[in-house]
Amino acid sequence: MSEFKNLPSEWKVVRLGEISSRVTRRNQDNRCQNVLTISAQSGLINQADFFNKQVASKDLSNYILLKKGEFAYNKSYSAGYSFGAFKRLKFYDEGVASPLYIYFKFNDDVCSDFFEFYFDAGQANRQIKDIVQEGARNHGLLNLSIDDFFNIKIRMPNLDEQKKIAEILSTWDEAINLTINLIESKKQFKKALMQNLLTAKIRFPQFKDEWKETKLGDFLEEKSERNTKNIDLILSVTNKFGFVTQVEYFDKSVASDNTANYKIVRKGNFAYNPSRINVGSIALLESYEIGILSPMYVVFECLKNLDNRFLKFWFQSHIFMGNLPKYLAGSVRESLNFNDMKTISIKLPNLKEQQKIAEVLTACDDEINLLNLKLENLKKQKQGLMQKLLKGEMRTCYVKKAM
């Protein structure tokens, strides 16, 4: 078992079958009705929650009954999991799942928490890769027998160090989950605040003027400038990230070789895909000075007396998204051209109040962006730690806990 290089002298290499046992208990008399599926991202979760319906048969007696803390291995390929996914039952006391998966539990003399991180970090992938030949799949499943599975080689420290490693990585998980929850809380706060500010339910005391109902067409102007200047920054608009470069989003340019007919979009302009606006694909260009978009996009700018950041938040709100279907009702493809956009009603305060509202909501976005940056840093720290701790390249005495 010498393929594990630079292994600390106190560590040893064992077969998975030496420290764990297969779980084969059946769901007799259909006792348990909690049908599970393995999600690469979410782990072992209720099938109805994952698919919004139960896809298993009514007779579950042949399903495997899994207890909390036990593991499942899904041999099928999924994005980011080329050699299958190991997941542990954490969210329920018990559940049943398809006999197609391999189930196992660790012996009492090892730390299951340690091995959860071990598998999450892909430490078993090299072993699985060596066992299965490239392309040796049966209906998308890796050609990995039960015997081969339990013959996988595992590197591990003694029990005390296993527990310390699991404790350290759990601290990072706690910090990550806390940050995720905080981000979600901030998003919900912004959503509620946005709804109240944009409907004048909450107002700043210095503003007393009545809001006026008007049409967007009174304040917008379409821009159709073509790419005669050979601009090469090709952009797309997404509902999640707003403006992105095509290379960044698609990992390649999907534009045609000749972009002379592409539309120019400048900082402060809006753009949207008429056939994707129903899912929120409309954005304000803030990160780049100038770029180009496919001719299918509509590009427009705000005229005076309409703050573009105020309009950005208005487009994000339920006031716009909730009423959008009625403007799409006559369109077979749920498409919104610019002439239809101009007919949409909007209630507006004066320009200074618009700017104040935009300032407050921008501050909310800044907080969320900082938390997202913190989250990404925590995830990178955890990934780096896992790779070093689980190989014995870094020992637990040198690790500071997550802040």
Question: Where do the model's predicted regions map?
Answer:
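Non-catalytic DNA-recognition/assembly elements of restriction-modification systems
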Residues: M1-N27, L159, F204-N227, T343
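A short glycine-rich beta-alpha junction/loop motif
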Residues: S2, S9, E94-L100, Q133-D160, ...
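Amphipathic alpha-helical segments
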Residues: L7-K12, F115, F150-K187, K191-A192, ...
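Sequence-specific dsDNA recognition surfaces
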Residues: G17-Q28, C32-Q33, S39-A72, G217-K267, ...
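A short beta-sheet element
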Residues: S61-A124, R137, E248, A260-F320, ...
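Acidic, low-complexity, intrinsically disordered peripheral segments
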Residues: K388-M403
